[in-house]
């Protein structure tokens, strides 16, 4: 992360010059109509008893009507909709505004607080494209009254986690997460086709995990873990939160992963189990950042000790 942060500090202003347009489709002819024959074909193939438009309205209505509308689809019907979270860009901006007003100022000291945390909770909306990291960043910079002149030119390229932007401590900490760690995950996924495999971790990390495979004091099956049926009640609570709310508190996510690493038969099994659970239940799963977070548990982006190296 340090070397990637150094790169960002040297090149970020250039990236600002080519940032996305607010409306990338402006001036582009948009024809969203679908041919009637194609609609009839879709209706026949899916065996729906309604037109596509009627079907969308039924799904949006939710409840038993929505579930019945979704029933013909080949999806995992055991994973229920998360009723406490509403999708869409409007909801994303409401949550962003709330975060900026009530949490950003204490993000640097409160993001790991499980009782009254300062985490943004925006990852599902970012994952589904309901809000852009650019919009979040620009909202913070505007709120802070930031200009390029606030950058600490003397520390540019040193990779400092705080102070380079010239923002408040909370904003500095959040922007580092939003840019450095998020983009690090996407950069890794772009360059490594095996980014979702334990084969992507360094050799020293793989050797270290293998050396400690026999250290496990307790073991559970995948089914027991998915059902949150362990003797660790804190871990069970995190797993239930994942299944019911589609998220795990940031601070508990690392505990969640490390315990699976401890309980699984092997590091490879642990990685597979974490990916399977996260991809199935997490609203921000199936994402480069999910995989880098999981493999951080497996020592990715950490440095070897003299004994390990």
Residues covered by each model-derived region:
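Trp/Phe/Arg-rich N-terminal binding region typifying the photolyase-homology
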Residues: 1-30, 240, 259-289, 293
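Glycine/tryptophan-enriched, flexible segments
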Residues: 2-199
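Secondary-structure transition/capping motifs at alpha-helix termini
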Residues: 143-148, 164-167, 245-249, 263-268, ...
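Short, mixed-charge aromatic SLiMs
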Residues: 162, 180, 203-210, 276-289
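Aromatic-anchored, charged helix-turn/loop surface patch used as a conserved interaction hotspot
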Residues: 176-238
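C-terminal structural cap/anchor segments
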Residues: 224-259, 264-267
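Polar low-complexity intrinsically disordered regions
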Residues: 295-299
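Conserved small/polar residues in nucleotide/adenosyl-binding loops
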Residues: 301-308
